[in-house]
Amino acid sequence: MQRGQRAGDGARWTAGGGRKVRRAILMWAAAGALTLATGCVTNPITGKQQFSLLQGESGKGQLISLAKGAVPQQFAADYGVVSDAQANAYVAQVGRKLVATLKPSDVVFPDMPFSFQVVNAVYVNAYAFPDGTIAVTRGMLAELENEAQLAAVLGHEIAHVNCGHTASAMSRGTVYDALVSGTRGYLASQGSSWADLAGTAGQLGSAVVLASYSREQERQADQGGMLYMVRAGYDPQGMIGLMQLLVRISGANPSALEQMFSSHPMSAERLRDAQSRAATEYAGQNRGTVSQEAFLANTAAIRKNKGALKQFAAAESQLAQKQYAAAKTSAEQGLRVAPNDYVGLMLVAQASQKGGQLAAARQAAALAARVSPSGARAQSVLAQCALQSKDYAGALQHLSAFERQVPGDARTAFYKGLAYEGQGQKQQAAQAYQAYVRRSGASSAEGQYAARRLQQLAPQN
């Protein structure tokens, strides 16, 4: 029994008391849902209504605002945009060619500010933010064979934006939170500590809703992507070739596409659908543009280092498994093929830092920062090395440099709290910890530490 709990309180969770609670929870949950479930939009691919709380110019503005905060963080995680101006311009050109085919009936939110970048990440993937910011990884470009396949990749991501898939997922997550908020409201009104548990369930539910596209959404994106590429003059076989390529890569190395398939679930059904659509709906258009020569010419610098990218991918996998020595070795082998590659240098820095070799970590991260001044992750590793060395002033300097490029990052606030504490600046430390808890909550180990330090640093009356 908890301190202050009355004898018999637990009986409310059994027999008749349990039924009463369940009925009340359902009423509160329904009330929460009814306040939100007010809107639908027409899915441009299926022609059917889909639930979305985000609509019109207001909804579009919210999606653009959401992406504005998320893009810098994701791009930093992917080691920034490549310095290869030719590859970047080429991918953007293909993307704009597809966007130029769009009609008002193709989109939920008109006139999204589409943009296309290649990011340094070595895993095989492409992704879209709800404002139309679309990124293709170096790992993906190194595997593709022609421009038609690239058009299939970009068309697929454009279709996710046009169908409002992120808005729909956010709306479902909001209603889920409303249901949980209703539950939490009743439990809190009854003085129950179970309200905290209900809140935790809501956070987990929203995370699952927003984590990936559904198989149905993937089918819609495939259909839209093929439509756009055919309109732009590309051979629809490019979509089929892309899917077959991904299946081959996954068969040879399942971990290579783990990240992609976690957000873009692949299936034999998707491949069959694409083959059927090319053979029927687009039967007379299977001799469209493939443009292998243009693709190979514009991606030559990236494909030249394909062997290095595979070594870097191996290093990332080894880092995740805490095999720091092996990760450093793999990254160094990749650097022999691609000297001064930013990702390779950063992997050496991270493996060295995690393995306790701070001097080697600082050296590699400092070189990475010189190679790519806009590469934010180098500043993060330098800050962590400084913290481990108790160089708190240096840590704050590097954290501020990182924050200028990636504003609003929660972990930066946490590390700032540690650095300020190290300097004895309690008020600044408390402010930093408070910022971390506000952005990330107190459920993680870091969040619990920050919340605990907040209490301990509070002025004593």
Regions found by a protein language model. Name each.
Residues 171-187, 197-209:
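Membrane-active amphipathic alpha-helices enriched in small hydrophobic residues
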Residues 154-163, 183, 220, 224:
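Active-site His/Glu-centered metal-binding helix of metallohydrolases
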Residues 3, 13, 17, 22-28, ...:
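Hydrophobic or amphipathic, alpha-helical segments that drive membrane association/targeting
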Residues 135-152:
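Short pre-active-site segment immediately N-terminal to the catalytic Zn-binding motif
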Residues 145-149, 158-175, 187:
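Catalytic Zn2+-binding segment of zinc metalloproteases
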Residues 86-89, 93-94, 109-114, 119-121, ...:
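Extracytoplasmic
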Residues 56-57, 65, 80, 208-209, ...:
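Extracytoplasmic and endomembrane cell-envelope/extracellular-matrix remodeling and assembly machinery
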Residues 91, 136, 156, 221, ...:
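Divalent metal-coordination and catalytic microenvironments
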